Amino acid sequence: MGEIKRIGILTSGGDCAGLNAVIRSVVHHAIGTYGWEVIGIQEATQGLMENPSKAIALHRDNIDHLLMMGGTFLGTTNKGNPFAFPMADGTVRDRTEDIIAGYRQLGLDALIGIGGDGSLAILRRIAQQGGINLVGIPKTIDNDVGATEISIGFDTATNIATEALDRLHFTAASHNRVMVLEVMGRDAGHIALAAGIGGGADIILIPEIPYRIQSVCNKIRQRQAEGKNFCLVMVSEAVRTELGDQVKQIQQFGEDRYGGIGKYIAEQIAQRTGAETRVTVLGHIQRGGIPSPFDRLLGSVFGVAAVDLIAEGKFDHMVAWRNRQTISVPIEEAIQTYQTVQLDGTLVKTARGLGICLGND
């Protein structure tokens, strides 16, 4: 490995809180400790496709305000597969070589990529093809990246979902209503389960546990019989019935995305129990806003650790969090495993111990 003089950093995939804390940390440590230059690549790999590349020099005197900012000031994208990138003329083209050329044009010696499992898989494939020295940092509100106990963005998203449930609690009790809250998470129920327990949900539905609508309605009837005429239902967007049925929405270009399950569950509850029911879809509110103190801390820790991995020449690795410590794991390990809720884990046991219905009672 040659001497490191200039590194790049980019954010890829969906945004979340805590990304700017990572960028700030990388800049402070790379410049202050090692004397390297740091280049921020804008709009993920799409910034490297441009000629010249879309990038800015980052300095310690222009990044301190980033710590408490949500989103990513570098910009990001979760659209446009670089291996089959849609062109203006309607065709698709593999832009891998353009991305590699952009990396070389900037004179980078290493690259820090902040992303979820999909983004890290793409970056790794490009790095292997182009000989790019890559270090990964996991981020996703879904907390589904393998090999790490937690990813950047999850804590803030969970806090937001918990606060939403707190607010719905008061209006549900005031009107004797069933309030259904739909949250993100893709095929992992981490947000729904953690926020549901923290926010006092009576029913929590997650993708890992197929639900029966009759079980849900029985819980509501039980509460009614006990004189509790309101109910809080937390629903993860990708939940499925015992037959595997899910609710999805068709988006532009025919792509389907999770969404609409909250409305469906609310309608079923109203029809079967007669309870006045309302639904709230939290949506992208979970991604935005001021990062939680823990996401600021985790972002700062991950940024320093990623820079140290570069200094050690430990490429094709990702920073991970285990037992309240940072470790490094091969990126391949992280993208080949998918972290879902463990059915015999502490949170599921806690939910059942609290009498929370998980849809299969």
From Swiss-Prot:
The record, for Pfam families, names:
PFK (PF00365)
Q: Which residues bind ATP?
A: G14, K79, G80, G116, D117, G118, S119
- Which residues does substrate bind? T140, I141, D142, R177, M184, G185, R186, E237, R278, H284, I285, Q286, R287
Its localization reads: Cytoplasm
**What are the binding positions for Mg(2+) in this chain?**
D117
Task: Please list the GO biological process terms of this entry.
Answer: fructose 6-phosphate metabolic process
Cofactors: Mg(2+)
A molecular function annotated in GO for this UniProt entry is:
metal ion binding
The keyword Protease appears for this protein? no
Predominant localisation class = cytoplasm
| Marked site (Important for substrate specificity) residue numbers | G118
Residue ranges that the Swiss-Prot or TrEMBL entry lists as coiled coil: none
The Enzyme Commission number assigned here is: 2.7.1.11
HAMAP family in alphabetical order: Phosphofructokinase_III
Assembly behavior: Homodimer or homotetramer.
Q: Which family does it belong to?
A: Belongs to the phosphofructokinase type A (PFKA) family. Mixed-substrate PFK group III subfamily.
The molecule here is called: ATP-dependent 6-phosphofructokinase 1
Q: What is the lineage of its organism?
A: Bacteria, Bacillati, Cyanobacteriota, Cyanophyceae, Synechococcales
